[in-house]
């Protein structure tokens, strides 16, 4: 039996909430299971690791950074807008912005989902639509909370893959496919540091990658949902996990 301790170590950014009156940081198991099924070893990253000296010690131990989704939203001041965000998680924002920039500098693989994509957009100088439902030209991208969870995560709309990017390389025989949709915010302005990898039929950005980086991919949908049952989702996670081999080889050449 393979020793999981030999698998690539993937740092997973946690989310803050409250449990019986106590400040708590958690991760949904679907995100962790997707990493394990793809051959990685997930390690939870609490927000205190945003401290620069701790982050500097942590990063050499990680083979990848995983930014899962969250009920919270990125604080608007981080992308130049005024106002408060009622569903904020400042600790996650602090860690995510710090670890994204540090990982990009060190060329560590990154996989970002939903809020994670939005963090990747903001960290590289872009901005967000705070309420997609107020943009008349856009589809309804939120889930129906009255439906059973299985139906909330059912395919909702198509995405069109842009040619010549990371996503098309991972999915060479698949230029468009259906995805689930469970988000109220989305990318508004994408910085020149990013490449748009896919869009929904209304033109909204559904996937991005960082230019001149071996693997820094963000997707707006949720491939972690029953990831082992869907070939497209497995390919994305396996691509992320195997990217660490290229990262190690690159470090050895330096």
UniProtKB/Swiss-Prot annotation:
Protein name in the entry: Gamma-glutamyl-gamma-aminobutyrate hydrolase
Its EC number(s): 3.5.1.94
Active-site residues annotated for this sequence: 114 (nucleophile), 222, 224
Sequence intervals crossing the membrane: none
Pathway annotation from the record: Amine and polyamine degradation; putrescine degradation; 4-aminobutanoate from putrescine: step 4/4
Catalytic activity: 4-(gamma-L-glutamylamino)butanoate + H2O = 4-aminobutanoate + L-glutamate
Function in brief: Involved in the breakdown of putrescine via hydrolysis of the gamma-glutamyl linkage of gamma-glutamyl-gamma-aminobutyrate.
A GO term, aspect molecular function: gamma-glutamyl-gamma-aminobutyrate hydrolase activity
Pfam families, per database record: Peptidase_C26
Primary gene name: puuD
GO CC, one annotated term: cytosol
Domain Glutamine amidotransferase type-1: 16-250
Originating species: Shigella flexneri
Keywords annotated in UniProt: Glutamine amidotransferase, Hydrolase
Biological process annotations from GO: putrescine catabolic process
Family designation: Belongs to the peptidase C26 family.
């Amino acid at each position: 039996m393979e020793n999981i301790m030999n698998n690539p170590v993937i740092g997973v950014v946690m989310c803050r909430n409250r449990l019986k009156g106590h400040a708590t940081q958690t991760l949904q198991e679907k995100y962790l299971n997707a990493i394990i099924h793809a051959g990685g070893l997930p390690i939870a990253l609490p927000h205190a690791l945003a401290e620069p000296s701790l982050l500097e010690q942590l990063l050499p131990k990680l083979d990848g950074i995983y930014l899962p989704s969250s009920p919270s939203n990125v604080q608007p001041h981080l992308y130049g807008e005024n106002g408060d965000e009622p569903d904020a998680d400042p600790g996650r924002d602090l860690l995510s912005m710090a670890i994204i920039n540090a990982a990009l500098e060190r060329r560590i693989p990154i996989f970002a989902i939903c809020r994670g994509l939005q963090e990747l957009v903001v960290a590289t100088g872009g901005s967000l639509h705070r309420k997609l439902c107020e943009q008349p030209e856009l589809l309804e991208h939120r889930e129906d909370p009255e439906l059973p969870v299985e139906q909330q995560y059912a395919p909702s709309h198509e995405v069109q893959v842009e040619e010549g990017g990371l996503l098309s390389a991972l999915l060479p025989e698949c230029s468009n496919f259906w995805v689930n949709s469970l988000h109220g915010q989305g990318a508004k302005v994408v910085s020149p540091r990013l490449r748009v990898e896919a869009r929904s039929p209304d033109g909204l950005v559904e996937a991005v990658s960082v230019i001149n980086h071996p693997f820094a991919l963000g997707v707006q949908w949720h491939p972690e949902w029953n990831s082992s049952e869907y070939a497209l989702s497995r390919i994305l996670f396996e691509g992320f996990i195997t990217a660490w081999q290229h990262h190690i080889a690159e470090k050895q050449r330096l």
